[in-house]
Amino acid sequence: LSVVIAFPAAFTDERALAHAIQRVATGTMGVRLEYNCIICEEARDVVELASQLSTMLGVGSVAIANKVSTNFSDLTAAIVEVGSKIINPGERFYVKVVIQPVAKCEYVSRDIEFAASSTLAGRLASIKALPAKTEKDASRLILTVIGKKSAYVCIQLMTAPGGLIAGSQGRVLSSIHDSLSFLSCLTAAKAGFDCTGIVLPYVDKSELEINAKLVQLFAARIGRKKQTILAIPINVPAKGVVSILLKEKIISKILMQCQNNRIVFPLTAAVHPIWFIESIIQETVSAGKTPFAPLLFLSDELGRYAKEAGIELNVSAVKVAKDKLRGYGNAVDSEARLAIKHTKRLELNIGPNYFHDVIDSI
């Protein structure tokens, strides 16, 4: 019997995640929490369910596994059988057995690991597959979880987004208009905030297409099925370096005028002047809103996060004097008001043609 196992991320409420999985695991006969993992049994399509859970926030990793007996001989044979099928020539494999506290067995994990590894080493000698000394040194992990009544030998392991359960911290409003804002939204979502509403500002058609692709990627990353988009054309009343801050300022004004009281800003001390960050935070608080800046204290980490998210991050520190921006105060307010008047609200289902649906709707 094949089952799907979801392993919660480090700070995820396991019971809440089990309930969340139960809601999405349609066609699954049983979803139960077993110590530090969630077992989904008798799924209509285990591959599809595993794929779905691998995009779910709050899940650290997902496995498709064979449900077998906890009997020492039977379990060892099951691990060897799975290993023989999934270990490729030349790979270094590591057999890892996790015995849950509720399990009732008369052996320790090392006993099973040693027995299965030894048998596999002999069986796979002809293809030069060798056991690794540690999990870190291995190119192939064979994981087995021993529960209260059954053991589960993992056939396939997949990483998942991690973070907290989507929406567990309430709703926020954010915009996606460049790589930094994309990372900001993604970080907020992984922290458990519900980013169902996304402001999509754009200066021209080219920028609209770029930003729409980022919105599509965001939806795919967090496994969303439906997204509300507020498409807003904007005009930046300047060129050059100062336009970067002006654009951010106009967008911040737009966000403050929207209904949601929690706003996510893509501000970071690595790029934006401190005085600029302080001004936006102060204005947001004065407007009765709560500002969030997930990237505020990040610098070198931004590049790594962008690579993990699958985007390019081409940013550098913006050096603009405070007085230079002050002269655009009236223009910023005027452009923000004008942009809001031309807002187009889109309610679209996420699918393979999502990008084109966004462009065509605007």
Language model regions located:
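Non-catalytic nucleic-acid substrate-recognition regions in nucleic-acid-modifying enzymes
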Residues: 9-102
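Non-catalytic substrate-recognition/targeting regions of SAM-dependent transferases
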Residues: 67-165
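Nucleotide-activated chemistry modules centered on ATP-dependent adenylation/adenylyltransferase
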Residues: 1-25, 30-50, 127-134, 138-362
